[in-house]
A protein has these predicted regions:
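Helix-to-loop junction immediately C-terminal to a conserved catalytic motif
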Residues: 76
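Conserved ABC transporter NBD signature motif
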Residues: 84-92, 104, 144
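Conserved ABC ATPase signature
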Residues: 161-165, 169-171
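Short coil-to-helix segment of the ABC ATPase nucleotide-binding domain corresponding to the Q-loop/switch region
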Residues: 121-129
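Catalytic Walker B motif of ABC-type/P-loop ATPase nucleotide-binding domains
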Residues: 186-189
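Conserved catalytic motifs of ABC-family nucleotide-binding domains
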Residues: 182
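ABC ATPase NBD coupling module
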Residues: 93-109, 138, 212
Length: 251
């Protein structure tokens, strides 16, 4: 079903799956006819309209080059759309001034496939950094960093450097860092791409638990077995276009 969006003169509103319509509250993410081009003959996204509500766990599926990573970058303002409008937490990302981008990113947690941990800092320091940049008091930083590491089962290794941990453990640290300031949105770009099957489930269970606590989660993955296992709403992309918006339980 297509509705009309609240901004601009869109030709039709964002795609809403049945699962989305049942969700409570207003959408935290809304895209209206979004396209992203890197030059002639290099179009990453084409006329994408979709919305995601609070507490949804949504998979972004598609082959390499489908536009999954580009969409993630647009949502946390690492890039700007060539056309269209993007509302994230009520803010028009396409028009957001550079000075206001940090405030938006403080409410968005991001997990990358390659972890992006600071190798010269301890596990606890990596997680604490997300709170320190917000100016939180040292006592609160230590308490919340420890509590989050305990949630992912790594509090006993908090003083070690990332290189001492396995790939799965480093990904858990990256997830703890992304969630420690209780973001409204979590973006996970191929978070299990380098992990074996057992560790993949371990990480995805933590991601699903974040959604159950009310965080809106988008997970980019090409792992169809993972999508079938969790049976959540799935946006299938190909060639930068949205081919299907499949409600949870339909795969």
């Amino acid at each position: 079903m297509n509705g009309r969006g609240p901004v601009g003169p869109p030709r039709s509103g964002p795609v809403r799956s049945p699962a989305t319509r049942r969700a409570g509250g207003d959408p935290l993410i809304r895209l209206f006819h979004v396209s992203k081009s890197y030059g002639p003959g290099s179009v990453a996204l084409r006329d994408l309209s979709v919305e995601v509500r609070k507490g949804e766990l949504v998979f972004l599926s598609g082959p390499s080059g489908a536009g999954k990573t580009t969409l993630m970058k647009l949502l946390f303002a690492a890039e700007r759309p060539t056309e269209g409008q993007i509302l994230v937490l009520g803010r028009n990302v396409a028009r957001l001034g550079e000075r206001r981008i940090p405030a938006l990113r403080r409410r968005i947690g991001v997990v990358f496939q390659d972890f992006k941990l600071i190798q010269t800092r301890s596990i606890e320091e990596n997680v604490a950094l997300a709170l320190q940049v917000l100016g939180r008091p040292p006592r609160e930083v230590r308490s919340k960093a420890f509590a989050m590491l305990r949630r992912v089962g790594l509090q006993h290794r908090r003083h070690e450097l990332p290189a001492a941990l396995s790939g799965g453990e480093q990904q858990r640290v990256a997830l703890a860092r992304a969630l420690v300031n209780e973001p409204a949105i979590l973006l996970a770009d191929e978070p299990t791409g380098n992990l074996d099957a057992e560790l993949t489930i371990e990480i995805m269970d933590l991601v699903a638990a974040a959604a159950a606590r009310g965080t809106t989660v988008l997970v980019a993955t090409h792992d169809q077995a993972l999508i079938r296992r969790y049976a959540r709403r799935t946006l299938r992309l190909a060639g930068g276009r949205l081919l299907e918006d499949i409600p949870g339980g339909s795969i």
